[in-house]
Amino acid sequence: MWIRARSTPAEAVTGLCRRVVLLLCSLALWARPGEAQRPLTVQGTRSLTFGSLLSGVNKSVLRSDAINGGQLDISGPKSVQVLLTFTLPASMTGPVGATLPLSFGSTDGGWSPPQQVGTQIAFDPRLPFTAPLDQNGKVSVYLGGTAKPTANQKAGSYTGTITLTVVVLP
């Protein structure tokens, strides 16, 4: 069964999975006494999107996918380390409470200097990870994953929430 993703509520419900929405929460900022610090900001640049899926056929999105891979841009104090902790869902929720299983592997997370998707360094998004902010106080974080629709997956749009907690380390 071919299933197509729905882009807007006005379109006919013929889709299965649209996207996992990247939401940001729990930002903490460490500051040295007596020093002015740039505030820590996180911008969700691109949501992790699975698009059209076939029932019973897994679909992986690479973290390096410049269209469908998730991207967050972090700004803060110059040349410091930040602790990144993702809260990843086991599934997305769709029509009438239907769920669509997700999985995230050991190389589905990546980081690089800002906006340099091609020079990412992989990390396991299931585990806390330390990444450096560059001399300008910036880093980009990327996320891929796998949607695992069942053979009898209910058609419709599915969404989920991914939370990234960022802490500036002393």
PLM regions and their residue ranges:
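Structured interface patches
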Residues: 101, 106-107, 122-124, 159-160
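Hydrophobic membrane-targeting signal helices
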Residues: 30-31, 123
